[in-house]
A protein has these predicted regions:
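Intrinsically disordered, low-complexity Pro/Gly/Ser/Thr-rich segments with frequent PxxP/GP/PP motifs
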Residues: 262-272, 645-675
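Surface beta-strand/loop "capping" patches
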Residues: 213-240, 595-635, 721-735, 849
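Accessory beta-strand-rich segments of carbohydrate-active enzymes
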Residues: 3-18, 37-38, 52-58, 84-92, ...
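An acidic-aromatic loop/edge-strand motif
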Residues: 84-87, 92, 99-108, 157, ...
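Extended substrate-binding grooves/exosites of carbohydrate-active enzymes
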Residues: 1-39, 88, 96, 151, ...
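Glycine/proline-rich low-complexity spacer/linker segments in large multi-domain proteins
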Residues: 2-26, 31-38, 153-154, 177-210, ...
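Beta-strand/loop-rich accessory regions of lumenal/periplasmic or secreted enzymes
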Residues: 87-89, 184, 278, 669-675, ...
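Extended acidic/polar, glycine-enriched regions
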Residues: 172-175, 237-308, 678-719
Length: 1012
């Protein structure tokens, strides 16, 4: 064995590492730009770049001491550091959620453990004023051994934390060689079972810090906020004591406090009339720590986090976390994430009204927290702990009692793991303790509860009593034991139903309630943002939540022939153990293109809302949902009045004061037309430029219907009232068909289905295939559980059959009434249906469909008609909710308007294809080209979908780049669709959004036409 087996030894977590300390970057002189340009410090030597690399499928294949001085690496490959070796073509990709990718046999890992050998030559010049040298690895998965110039330096683990080694005595002036052996797994891998692609290597920065002999080693900044005074306390540790000059400056560079360190290593500085930090105004002071040969520049955010009466306050104000869970993930770089990539994420989050981030499920790179300080995000910092795997071990009795008991016993409540678990929490807290964006420490994720987490919580609360503690998995416990929860500050839940939240508030409510994960954003969804928002706002004990999750996780594998990126998820690399596309559950696509779910979130969490509007008096009442800013200081409000989707007036509202969490009134007197569908839309614009946000950025909108008594869309009404010509109809019947012919049209209805098989108008055939009654949709990710019931009911195989048909012909029209049903093999009749078609001499078709569902069947996915139209009908105009897709429980980001689009534009290209692109609350839709078209219209609003893909194709294909277009425009006119929800990892669709109707009636009109 080339190295000692520390990787399977819980008694050796680290060897020769420096004590954990706060993150900072020193320099020989004052440098104020090191948050985003730390490599410019003359005391930081970045070792990133091209390294020599050799991948071994087994540690036993390493025959040579590659780490020896002057070892010949000519036969080694090259790899970029930082990176993960799977993204460089070594090993295989694997995505797994809960299951360990190796046997559960702690502390042991597979004997033939894969590993990577890294070698890098670099030049080093000793600085006489900074003669000490410390080698830092900010992230290595999973554990590693390190040598310099052939001398063993040390060993460490905890993939997402910094490991620091004193290498002063092994470095030499001139050329040096660092060698690193990285193991794919170690005993620590049992604590790193996070829901993500499993990747390996040196994935964060590597650098040397040059330090004076007499220098600060660590410091802890604490603050106390009083009425008009802030006290800043510093506790400082040294490698060797030295004098320290301390100064604090405001954002304009004015010195507001001076001080020095006393003999105890402490200092207290006072700031009069302090500016407090919050997410809306992230004010930072600059802290300068100056010694004889070194300057450390840091920043301070003055803020106070506390819990009073089970309510969380920031600076004395009740707050709500508008948060999101964020993994380090990129389709090209894996979980090697640059500062630029983080900036992209933070910018998108600000643009979409987030104010908080959970570092799920491990600490991020240290500069991430500096950026959150700067840009105004509250953070839950989470330890690099997830031991979910024991939940999946074999149990003879698979009851909840036994499941939780066994889960707890294996790691959380086994004292042999105490040092490892507490170590990970300490490393996080020590490194990030000076980052004021962090308002809450999380002990980890989904690892059950026991004595080891009691110890971790106890240490954390004793060390840092000013921050909140959180650990959702505390609720998963061994019911035979009594545990201590006294150091846990909030009650956290993942994906609870609204009824479960209410039950806690009614029966317990002893701690603030935190939705640490909610509204699972997988595929088309979520559909319940608004409902959770209302629950959060209705009770002060509800402190908000963190949506799961920020981005889809996928691996990019080039471009398909159709130009689409080939994104791979679980199982696409041949791995046996995987969890499919469960990693595709973000608010943005892997490349950070925005999902419609993110648009939905943005408008649900808009800064203000209309409480009421009286169109007669013009009184407008708004509620300000900002926590700290008066609305007049943050938002400029414009308005638009539309009639049947067209803007008829618009202007800017005069500013008026609405205090945070308060309501305010103004007058907006507008002249509403006597007829038509009229809406008043208030648009909230950012009033001032902010970090990451431009002035006039749209923060959200409100829409209120202000129609008068004649509240019908005139465009829809015009088509529906189209008058018949004087020509008579010809009707011919046989055993299977009914032919209806007018001056400009010829239609055929199949007696066996009671539906159209031909629809010719002006000599053109509109239907490529027969019309269908449609109750199926390509299951969404959020349909993953109800889909089983739907398929058991054979909804996906359903078809229409007719029993009797009666034809009644008049002078200018014909009425065809059929008794029919929707049926499928092996099951009873799903729907009993009466279908009535009225066709007038102009070719207009009025439909009236009455349906009765057998009550034994589950909720329907949808009900409507599906037509396969001439593919040349590619241009769309519609009056309804748009421009993006919208559903009965997912339309907060859509608004009523008269929209134009191309059929291809309506497709939402989810990486795993599924139902998408529907438009809710429509009264009129027109598909056309330059010469002819067809209109669907109704008095009662409907949904429609126009796509180049059939629902069968969407269901069949597992990746978007595999989709093949139909020969038709697939046009669905729907009475209703079942809600979207978030049941992929959340509660079932709320009752009010379920399509559970037993009796329903769908009336609509179809009108083919030619232009001119």
């Amino acid at each position: 064995m080339i190295v000692p087996r520390y990787y399977e030894n819980l008694n050796v977590l680290h060897e020769n590492t420096m004590p954990a300390r706060a993150y900072y970057i020193p320099a020989s002189k004052r440098m104020d730009n090191l948050v985003e340009h730390r490599e410019e410090s003359d005391r930081m030597q970045l070792l990133n770049g091209t390294w020599k690399f050799q991948y071994f499928t087994s540690i036993y294949n390493i025959k040579d001491s590659f780490f020896e001085k002057n070892y010949d690496t000519e036969n080694f490959d090259e790899i970029q550091v930082p990176s993960v070796w799977q993204m460089a073509g070594y090993d295989t990709h694997q995505y797994t959620n809960i299951r360990y990718p190796f046997p559960f046999d702690p502390p042991y890992v597979p004997q033939d453990i894969p590993c990577g050998a890294y070698v890098h030559n670099f030049e080093y010049s000793r600085d006489e004023k900074a003669s000490k040298a410390f080698l830092n690895f900010e992230g290595v998965d999973s554990c590693f051994y390190v040598w310099i110039n052939g001398s063993y330096v040390g060993y460490s683990q905890v993939s997402h934390m910094t490991s620091e080694f004193d290498v002063t005595d092994v470095l030499q002036d001139g050329t040096n060689t660092v060698a690193v052996l990285v193991m794919k797994w170690c005993d620590g891998s049992y604590l790193e079972d996070q829901d993500k692609f499993r990747m390996s290597g040196i994935f964060r920065d590597v650098y040397i810090l040059k330090r004076p002999e007499q220098a600060i080693s660590d410091y802890h900044i604490k603050s106390k906020i009083e009425d008009i005074l802030a006290k800043v306390e510093l506790d400082v540790k040294f490698y060797s004591p030295t004098n320290v000059k301390i100064s604090i400056e405001d954002k304009n560079g004015a010195v507001v406090a001076l001080g020095s360190i006393d003999e105890e290593g402490t200092a207290v500085l006072e700031i009069a009339s302090p500016e407090l930090w919050n997410t809306e105004n992230p004010y930072l002071y600059k802290l300068i720590l100056e010694t004889e040969n070194e300057v450390i520049v840091d920043h301070i955010a003055l803020r106070k986090v506390e819990i009073k009466d089970q309510v969380i306050y920031l600076n004395g104000q009740k707050i709500k976390f508008r948060g999101v869970n964020r993994h380090d993930s990129d389709p090209v770089t894996g979980f090697t994430i640059s500062l630029e990539q983080i900036t992209t994420d933070l910018t998108l989050m600000k643009q979409h009204n987030f104010n908080a981030i959970r570092s799920s499920h491990y600490p991020n790179a240290p500069f991430f927290y500096e950026m959150c300080d700067k840009y105004g995000f509250m953070v839950i910092d989470e330890a690099d702990i997830e031991a979910h795997g024991p939940f999946m071990i074999y149990r003879k009795e698979d009851t909840d009692y036994n499941r939780f008991k066994r889960w707890n016993e294996k790691i959380a409540d086994d004292p042999v793991w105490e040092e490892a678990i507490v170590d990970r929490v300490k490393l996080m807290v020590e490194r990030d303790k000076n980052r004021f964006c962090i308002v809450m420490w999380s002990m980890g994720n989904e690892s059950a509860y026991g004595c080891n987490f009691e110890k971790a919580l106890e240490w954390t609360k004793n060390y840092d009593p000013d921050r909140i503690t959180q650990y959702e998995s505390a609720r998963y416990r061994n019911y035979d034991e009594t545990y201590d929860y006294s150091n846990l500050d909030v009650y956290s839940r993942m994906y609870p139903a609204l009824s479960e939240i209410q039950e806690y508030l009614d029966k317990d409510g002893s701690k603030p309630f935190l939705l640490v994960e909610y509204c699972h954003s997988m595929g088309n969804g979520p559909g319940d943002f608004e409902d959770y928002f209302q629950m959060i706002q209705d009770n002060d004990k509800m402190c908000g939540g963190f949506v799961w999750e920020w981005c889809d996780h996928a691996i990019a594998h080039g471009t398909a022939e159709n130009g689409k990126t080939i994104y791979a998820y679980g199982g696409d690399h041949g791995e046996e153990i995987h969890d499919g596309n469960f990693c595709m559950d973000g608010l943005v696509y892997p490349n950070r293109t925005v999902h419609t779910g993110l648009l939905e979130y943005k408008n649900v969490y808009r800064p203000a809302r209309v409480i009421s509007y009286d169109k007669e008096s013009g009184e407008l009442v708004l509620h300000n949902y900002m926590d700290f800013d008066d609305l007049k200081d943050y938002v400029k409000i414009s308005y638009e009045l539309t009639q049947d989707g067209l803007v008829i007036s618009k202007d800017i509202l005069s500013e008026f004061s609405v205090v945070p969490h308060g309501e305010g009134k103004t007058n907006l007197k507008i002249s509403v037309p006597e007829n038509g569908k009229c809406y008043l839309k208030l648009i909230y614009h950012l009033k001032k430029e902010l970090p990451l946000l431009d002035e006039d950025h749209i923060l959200g909108f409100d829409e209120s219907e202000v129609s008068k008594d004649d509240a019908k869309c005139k465009l829809a009404e015009k088509w529906m009232q189209k008058t018949a010509t004087d020509s008579e109809l010809q009707v011919n019947e046989d055993d299977t068909q009914i032919h209806i012919k007018g001056r400009e049209f010829a239609y055929t209805i199949d007696r066996r289905t009671a539906l159209f098989t031909e629809m010719k108008f002006a000599g053109r055939e509109y239907l490529n295939h027969p019309m269908e009654l449609n109750i199926w949709r390509a299951p969404t990710d959020n349909d993953m559980y109800i889909k089983a019931e739907w398929k058991k009911a054979h909804y996906d195989k359903a078809y229409t059959r007719a029993y009797t048909t009666e034809v009644v012909q008049g002078k200018h029209g014909v009425k065809i009434v059929s008794h029919a049903s929707v049926v499928a093999e092996t099951v009873q009749k799903i729907l009993d249906v009466t279908i009535t078609w009225k066709i007038d001499a102009s070719g207009k078709i009025d439909a009236d469909i009455e349906a009765t569902k057998d009550g034994e069947f589950p909720d329907l996915p949808r009900f409507g008609v599906r037509m396969f139209l001439d593919k040349k009908l590619a241009d769309i105009r519609y009056f309804g909710m748009g421009p993006q897709e919208s559903y009965r429980d997912k339309h907060q980001a859509a608004s009523h308007g008269l929209y134009r689009a191309n059929v291809g534009d309506l497709h939402e290209d989810y990486i795993r294809p599924q139902e998408n692109g529907s438009h809710y609350d429509c009264e009129y839709v027109e598909l056309n080209n330059s010469r002819y078209g067809i209109v669907a219209s109704a008095e009662k609003a409907f949904s429609f979908n126009a796509s180049y893909y059939t629902q069968e194709e969407l269901e069949k294909k597992t990746h978007n780049y595999e989709l093949i277009e139909s020969d038709s425009v697939v046009f669905c006119v729907d009475y209703a669709l079942n809600g979207i929800g978030s049941n992929s990892c959340g509660p079932v669709v709320l009752e009010q959004y379920r399509f559970d109707d037993v009796l329903f009636r769908f009336q609509f009109t179809l009108i083919p036409y030619v232009k001119g």
